């Protein structure tokens, strides 16, 4: 498995190359032994007025971009910070071999 820093950089490159309005804000390892995976949180910036539909569309494009780079991805949780009006989503991501973007 690649390092957390390399994963974060590669995921941000996938986001940037796909012109998505997301930012990787946290990455860590999770799971145990042979069932380990990366847990990655992305933020959607200020969408204003709780525009969940737009955010879901961006997250769907993010998941498609990650999958097209050979990784398995699933949604763990998502929430909205009502004070800052920022959307957050945490994903589980797994790749058995190779690197993102190769």
Each predicted region: which residue ranges?
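Short intrinsically disordered terminal tails
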Residues: 1-2, 9, 95-102
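An N-terminal amphipathic alpha-helical segment
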Residues: 2-44, 48
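Acidic, low-complexity, intrinsically disordered interaction modules
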Residues: 31-90, 95-99
């Amino acid at each position: 498995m690649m390092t957390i820093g390399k994963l974060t950089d590669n995921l941000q490159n996938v986001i940037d190359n796909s012109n998505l309005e997301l930012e990787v804000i946290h990455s860590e390892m999770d799971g145990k032994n042979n069932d380990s995976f990366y847990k990655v949180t992305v933020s959607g910036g200020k969408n204003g007025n709780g525009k969940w539909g737009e955010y879901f569309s961006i997250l769907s494009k993010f998941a498609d971009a990650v999958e097209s780079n050979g990784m398995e991805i699933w949604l763990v949780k998502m929430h909205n910070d009502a004070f800052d009006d920022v959307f957050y989503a945490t994903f589980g991501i797994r790749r058995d071999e190779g690197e993102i973007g190769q």
